[in-house]
């Protein structure tokens, strides 16, 4: 099941969801604010100022984001961006395993983007997973998103099957969505980019 902050409420599916089912949720800071439980596997891709019209200050926003892992058990998994100062600090109070990803650093363990290629690092050994020219998504931020997805599903999905899906995935509506090509110019709908950080990532793509 897929839901959360992407317009699909799962409350309507509660009678269908079984204990063994897997649920993928995108959770915003104001959904996380009052949460007393955390998903078994969580990810924080970045922490930058956002939703400050809802939160009393930036620190409250940061604290809300951290609720996605604060109540995990020691069997939990937290995936975080090693390139963002605030997300990198989250590994210090994580209770379970931490998987890092980076597009700027070399990692002994985790996932990196190097020269347009997503690689898995294991004890310093780098394994080619998928490259920019093999996928339909544009931008280094989408390669970082692929790192996140691979880390989240590492213990659940065969990597080769995951890569097959990644190669065919064309993205979601309103996020660098190709509308049409006219007179050699590609027109994109990126109306989901509601913060400077997202807008800059889209423009760099």
Residue locations for each model-derived region?
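Short beta-strand-centered segment that lines the nucleotide-binding/catalytic pocket of NTP-utilizing
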Residues: 1-9
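Flexible active-site lid/hinge loop adjacent to a nucleotide/diphosphate
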Residues: 6, 17-101, 113-114, 119, ...
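Active-site-proximal loop->helix
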Residues: 12-16
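Beta-strand->loop->alpha-helix junctions that form or flank phosphate-binding loops
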Residues: 3, 95-114, 163-167, 177
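Short glycine/serine/threonine-rich phosphate/pyrophosphate-binding segments
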Residues: 8-10, 27, 195-199
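Acidic-glycine-rich active-site phosphate/pyrophosphate-binding loop
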Residues: 112-130, 172-180
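Nucleotide phosphate-binding/pyrophosphate-handling subdomain across enzymes
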Residues: 131-205
